[in-house]
Amino acid sequence: MDAAAGKASLIKVVDPAPRQIPAPDAVQRALNLLKTAKRPLIVLGKGAAYAQADADIRALVEKTGIPYLPMSMAKGLLPDTHELSAAAARSYVLPEADVVMLIGARLNWLLSHGKGKTWGGKDHKAWGGQKFIQIDISPQEADSNVRIDAPVVGDIGSCVSAMLGGISAMGAGWPKPSADWLGAITERKDRNVAKMGETLARNPSPMNFHSALNVMRDIVKTNPDAILVNEGAN
């Protein structure tokens, strides 16, 4: 078969990723739980990045005022410099949060399966007491490791859009996180950033990986359009 015939034989997919709309009662259950939170947290995962629903996810974060923690594959979805980013306070927010909304993030080994000391549990198998909202396209992910109190199954874009609709319907009645919670996160972020700054400022010989990170940080600051490539081989 020549190239022209091969190209002509290809079948065009009309709708490669049809929307999967979440059940309205599941969305309402998630919103009801989120409203009760005293120390809410949003965790953004790889699925959130793949969904290409950046604008809606940002709107959800900013409308609710809930701090967010990006997983490594969700970096860049929202900036780490955003005032609601808890990226520099990960070890503080995970065990302290009382309601955690997972958006395209799964409770696998990267999140210690939702339990253990990472989440404030007494030992590596103990549940920390958090309540989870999980937005995911796969129903099999709900309750795979710990209880998911409010699973919302559907594509990320449709689920986040539905959540936004429910929040907007409440208008000014949506409760924002307390100043104490946000202030505690900011204090921990500032402390960790200052501590890392001291480490990066050292210039040992031979150089270590912190030295390289310091140089790269300076390059990015002066060249914000620079593209960094991380080669992931072990």
Per-region residue spans from a language model:
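Short acidic (Asp/Glu) and glycine-rich catalytic loops that position anionic groups and cofactors
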Residues: 10, 139-143, 191-195
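Active-site diphosphate/adenylate-binding microenvironment
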Residues: 186-234
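Proline-centered turn/helix-capping motifs that create local helix->coil transitions or kinks
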Residues: 1-6, 175, 225-228
